[in-house]
């Protein structure tokens, strides 16, 4: 997990893509990453073909490189390998970490741990590069099956110094509390991409 321990406190955002890539997305992404608050960008497209994800992925990867943001692929280790992305995020039902390592070697592999210390311990044992816990709040991006709490975050911090990503409905009204409780990265999607009041770049500017 040493790859990302040298993180920059100002870059606390782990940005997740909208579920559909519209044509103004690329311009918005540049404006968002330009704010220098993002450490990771995760491409999470459930409905596109491999080929389409490859085309979109290449465009996004260029933008991420320009702004020194790590480019992570959700679920699809083969896509991560093909794109030579910086890493892959695996859910509990996705490919196992050992299999993923065979494909992408020393790249970043993050693991969804829901609200479970037991899952976190397994991920730590398997040398995950970061642990993702959630949902901390109700989310518009994903149905909430697991509810995570600040006490869970504190427990996880006691057992590991592997970076922790917190996820689930994070927005301007609740992000500060997670930072104060020393979450390393905040996974954010809907607040940036589906904000009815603010453009993406203005939404991210408010998070300081």
PLM features per residue range, with description:
Residues 9-27, 108-115, 165-166, 170:
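Active-site mouth loops of central-metabolism enzymes
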Residues 12-14, 38-42, 68-72, 86-89, ...:
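Structural preference for beta-strand elements that scaffold enzyme active sites
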Residues 15, 90-100, 132-144, 175-208:
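Glycine-rich phosphate-binding active-site loops on the catalytic face of alpha/beta enzymes
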Residues 19, 45, 92, 113-115, ...:
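Short secondary-structure boundary segments
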Residues 29-44, 126:
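Catalytic domains of carbohydrate-active enzymes, especially glycoside hydrolases
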Residues 32, 71-86, 115-127, 159-166, ...:
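Catalytic cores of alpha/beta
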Residues 54-73, 94, 99-116, 145-171, ...:
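Alpha-helix-loop-beta-strand connector modules within alpha/beta enzyme cores
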Residues 82-92, 111-158, 195-203:
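Glycine/Thr-rich beta-alpha phosphate-binding loop at enzyme active sites
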């Amino acid at each position: 997990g040493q790859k990302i321990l040298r993180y920059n406190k100002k870059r606390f955002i782990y940005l997740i893509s909208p579920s559909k890539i519209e044509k103004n997305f690329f311009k918005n992404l540049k404006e968002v990453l330009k704010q220098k608050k993002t450490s990771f960008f995760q491409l999470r497209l459930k409905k596109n073909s491999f080929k389409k994800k490859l085309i979109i992925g290449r465009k996004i990867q260029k933008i991420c490189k320009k702004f020194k943001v790590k480019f992570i692929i959700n679920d699809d280790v083969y896509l991560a390998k093909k794109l030579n992305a910086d890493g892959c995020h695996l859910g509990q039902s996705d490919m196992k970490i050992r299999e993923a390592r065979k494909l992408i070697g020393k790249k970043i592999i993050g693991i969804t741990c829901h609200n479970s210390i037991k899952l976190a311990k397994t991920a730590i044992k398997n040398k995950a590069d970061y642990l993702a816990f959630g949902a901390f709040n109700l989310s518009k991006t994903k149905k909430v099956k697991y509810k995570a709490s600040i006490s869970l975050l504190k427990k996880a911090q006691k057992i590991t110094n592997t970076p922790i990503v917190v996820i689930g409905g994070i927005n301007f009204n609740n992000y500060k509390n997670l930072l104060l409780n020393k979450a390393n990265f905040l996974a954010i999607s809907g607040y940036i991409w589906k904000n009815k009041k603010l453009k993406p770049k203005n939404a991210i500017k408010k998070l300081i």
